[in-house]
């Protein structure tokens, strides 16, 4: 049976989600989506005109193959995020939304209090909410409690390409999760995506590492393969780590060789 990802009753065969913020052109974004076969693409509402079917970005997204996930990038508080989500639903008809509430342009870290407020209110309004969050196991539980369809903890600050910087707390979030965990932001290399999947994450979201690569399409393919490999390793069951050596060959029944002839 195929290993499918399910979020809010919708199934996906690809566990690689793609962000659209930094591509040099909409055409490169389109080629990346086709190459990596991603089925979830997130778009900042402030960058698109949902009322225009010829919009540069939206016209390159095959919504028959790819789930459109609008995000509230630019929102500084819950009120602004809620307003953007409602605009997205009115303009596109989708009730899916990725909540991003980022008040500080220097750190670009999500506001936990406002994110929780926005998530709770939008769930009440019938939205399928995927909140972007810090690596905070308690916040992850609270977001699940108020109805988040998935949680999206960052690997590292957005755009840094640093990879997983807080593995312990990320593992806590994954271990206690009742909804899918999507690692979002800071994944800078395919190996980072593979590690996230090996740890038990349900999916990863990547933008910068692909968009700024010398060959974005080739990098997208590399991330897709890494995501598949990491997931396969997790399902296979990774061996436990040990601080001391353990022989892989038998240590009993050794052959004794007489080297006296060398004298």
From Swiss-Prot:
UniProt-listed SUPFAM superfamilies: ThiG-like
Catalytic activity: [ThiS sulfur-carrier protein]-C-terminal-Gly-aminoethanethioate + 2-iminoacetate + 1-deoxy-D-xylulose 5-phosphate = [ThiS sulfur-carrier protein]-C-terminal Gly-Gly + 2-[(2R,5Z)-2-carboxy-4-methylthiazol-5(2H)-ylidene]ethyl phosphate + 2 H2O + H(+)
Localisation per UniProt entry: Cytoplasm
Catalytic activity, EC: 2.8.1.10
Chief localisation class: cytoplasm
Active-site positions on this chain: 98 (schiff-base intermediate with dxp)
GO molecular function: thiazole synthase activity
UniProt keyword list: Cytoplasm, Schiff base, Thiamine biosynthesis, Transferase
Entry similarity comment: Belongs to the ThiG family.
HAMAP family assigned to the protein according to its UniProt record, in alphabetical order: ThiG (MF_00443)
Protein name in the entry: Thiazole synthase
Source organism: Desulfotalea psychrophila (strain LSv54 / DSM 12343)
């Amino acid at each position: 049976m195929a290993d499918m990802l399910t979020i809010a009753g919708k199934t996906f065969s690809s566990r690689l989600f793609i962000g659209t913020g930094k591509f040099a052109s909409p055409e490169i974004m389109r080629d990346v989506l086709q190459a990596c076969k991603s089925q979830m693409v997130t778009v900042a509402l402030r960058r698109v005109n949902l009322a225009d079917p010829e919009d540069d970005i939206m016209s390159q997204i095959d919504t028959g193959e790819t789930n459109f996930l609008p995000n509230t990038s630019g929102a500084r508080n819950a009120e602004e995020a809620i307003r953007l989500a409602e605009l997205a639903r009115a303009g596109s008809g989708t009730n899916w939304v990725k909540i991003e509430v980022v008040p500080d342009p220097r750190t670009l870290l999500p506001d936990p209090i406002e994110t929780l407020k926005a998530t709770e209110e939008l769930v009440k309004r019938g939205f399928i909410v995927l909140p972007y969050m810090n690596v905070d196991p308690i916040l992850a539980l609270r977001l699940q409690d108020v109805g988040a369809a998935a949680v999206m903890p960052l690997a590292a600050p957005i755009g840094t390409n640093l990879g997983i910087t807080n593995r312990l707390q990320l593992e806590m979030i994954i271990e206690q999760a009742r909804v899918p965990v999507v690692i979002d932001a800071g994944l800078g290399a395919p190996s980072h995506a593979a590690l996230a999947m090996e740890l038990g994450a349900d999916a990863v979201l990547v933008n910068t590492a692909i968009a700024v690569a010398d060959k974005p399409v080739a990098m997208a393919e590399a991330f897709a393969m890494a995501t598949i490999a990491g997931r396969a390793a997790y399902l296979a069951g990774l061996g436990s780590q040990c601080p001391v050596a353990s022989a892989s060959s038998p240590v009993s029944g050794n052959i004794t060789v007489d080297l006296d002839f060398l004298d």
